[in-house]
Design a protein with these regions (language model features):
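Membrane-proximal transmembrane or re-entrant/amphipathic helices at the cytosolic face
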Residues: 2, 477-536
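Membrane-interface junctions at transmembrane-helix termini in multi-pass inner-membrane proteins
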Residues: 142-164, 373-403
Length: 536
């Protein structure tokens, strides 16, 4: 009886998703930041380059189909659940598992077969091979985990997924710290015996790869355990299915693939630029520099991408994805006011994440200060990547990604090959990618919603407010670091920048006294706005 009550509803007695998802996202972000910091700190910039050059390749394979398939399965299962077609929902799960296994077998086999070609064209050198082989095994576990995550999301069970994600990332952080340290020590011994410079860095990258793999495997196991725990609940759902309609598994597989491909192509365009940039960098610079110096330079760039840019973009993607279905439903039903509210909220979340990480960037070297601009542009690109497919513009998102990637490749070739700017050329290429993506995305978005949504208040003015705030944060950070310690610098810059962002939104008529009163702590914000004279 107790178990029946416990499994009557997956979400029952759990905290609200509005509070739970951001809190868990923050915890995962901190764990990932800690993991990335451990990798860079224990392996050095050269070891980080060995690891991240492989990780970018595996990340493309992991996200393009498994992550996209998760979203498509969640939508399809939710529709069946609303119609009490739980057997068809289970059929979608089975089809997703089949697609995941086939995809994993194909991609893992291809990566094994073409590993030598990757080492000669994309990665640093042969020292990256073992790291590639270890991370390659992650694909199967991540694909299966994503399939079950989509099924849980479709049935409304976010809490088990969040618990499994926290468990997996916690194990990932601990395992990375242990194995990276262990393999670095073994690598130092091997380097002394073999007298081969740089061996310890390759060993450290292998240890980091084992830690990442352990975290993904544990997350997959935790999700399967959660599925087994709620098995009696799922069986009761099947008994409640009164529909006579049955869906053929082959037909479901075909329809899922047809829905996944345009979205997967959009994600592919967003993820390919780090791989292309590192390929151009290694092939261009390899003739004039040794592997250790190249790995050190690329490690500095990858440390920026992994620690300062990748994590906030990942969280921005998670928070923006949360609103995708609501925007899609509101757009189809003609509720453009709801679309505007949700889109504005997504912009706000992305900008807050970008600005928070930009403060850290402003305290570092010139390379990281360039990342301030790139992070804002890429964060808005992630927002458009979610918004365009949500309003049935997947092809526009794909075209936008192709054009942005082409601009990135051209810029990388000119800055790295012709102008010999090295890693600075790679960062300039990222800025160009984000700029082209944002401009084209806004153009397509404007055509889709022209006359139905106030684009000025929904997109243009928030972007302008964010740009004003970003410039102010950079200048404030540079000013305060002259006489304040880093922690006080961050706190002072955040507080003042929030005020600047608030004033900019009010002066550009994005927010009014009435809308502010509906915010969390709205009355306090309204009194503050009246005190500084921006509201009557």
């Amino acid at each position: 009886m107790g178990k029946r009550k416990r499994t009557e509803n997956i979400q029952k007695n759990y905290p609200s998703e509005e509070l739970l998802i951001p809190a868990v996202a923050l915890m995962i972000m901190l764990l990932l930041a800690w993991t990335w910091t451990i990798i860079v700190a224990k392996t050095g910039l050269s070891g980080a380059a060995y690891f991240f050059s492989v990780f970018h390749v595996i990340l493309v394979v992991m996200v393009v189909l498994p992550y996209t398939l998760k979203s498509v399965i969640a939508i399809a299962v939710r529709k069946r659940a609303e119609q009490n077609q739980f057997r068809n929902a289970k059929c979608i799960l089975n089809a997703g598992i089949l697609i995941s296994i086939i995809y994993s077998i194909i991609t893992v086999s291809l990566l094994y077969i073409f590993s030598d070609s990757l080492l000669q064209s994309v990665l640093i050198n042969q020292k990256s091979q073992l790291t590639l082989m270890i991370l390659n095994t992650v694909i199967l576990f991540y694909s299966i985990a994503c399939t079950f995550m989509g099924y849980f999301e479709g049935l409304g069970g976010s809490f088990p997924l969040l618990l499994a994600s926290i468990t997996g990332h916690l194990v990932m952080t601990i395992a990375t710290a242990i194995f990276t340290d262990l393999f670095m020590k073994q690598g130092e011994k091997a380097a002394n015996v073999l007298r081969i410079q740089g061996t310890q860095y390759a060993y450290g990258a292998v240890g980091a790869a084992i830690g990442i793999t352990a975290g993904i495997v544990i997350m997959c196991i935790a999700i399967l355990v959660m599925y087994q725990f709620y098995s009696s609940y799922f069986r009761r759902l099947l008994k409640r299915d009164t529909s006579r309609r049955r869906t053929d598994t082959v037909d479901v597989v075909t329809r899922l693939i047809r829905q996944v491909l345009p979205i997967a192509g959009s994600y592919l365009m967003m993820l390919l630029y780090p791989v292309i940039d590192q390929t151009i960098f290694f092939r261009t610079m390899g003739s004039g520099q040794d592997a250790i110096l190249m790995s050190y330079q690329w490690g500095a760039y990858d440390g920026l991408y992994g620690g300062v840019m990748f994590l906030p973009l990942l969280i921005a993607l998670a928070l923006a994805s949360r609103e995708r279905e609501k925007i899609s439903l509101a757009f189809r039903s003609g509720d453009y006011h709801e679309v505007r509210i949700k889109a504005h909220g997504m912009i706000r979340d992305n900008i807050i994440i970008s600005l928070f990480f930009m403060v850290e960037s402003a305290l570092a070297v010139r390379l990281i200060r360039c990342g301030c601009i790139a992070l804002i542009l890429l964060s808005l690109s992630v927002l458009l990547l979610i918004l365009l497919p949500a309003i049935n513009m997947s092809i526009a998102a794909l075209i936008t990604g192709i054009c942005a990637l082409a601009a990135n490749v051209l810029t990388a070739f000119l800055t790295i090959k012709v102008l010999s700017l090295g890693v600075y050329g790679a960062m300039i290429s990222v800025i160009v990618f984000g700029l082209v993506y944002v401009l084209l995305g806004i153009m397509f978005l404007g055509r889709a919603v022209r006359g139905r949504i106030d684009l000025r208040k929904t997109f243009y003015c928030p972007f302008l407010s964010a740009a004003i705030t970003g410039i102010a944060m950079l200048l404030l950070g540079l000013l305060f670091e002259l006489f304040l310690p880093p922690i006080l610098n961050v706190l002072a810059t955040l507080v003042i920048s929030f005020v600047i962002y608030f004033i900019a939104l009010a002066k550009l008529d994005v927010i009014s006294a009435y809308s502010v009163s509906r915010f969390p702590f709205g009355e306090l914000l309204l009194r503050f706005g009246k005190m500084i004279g921006i509201f009557p």
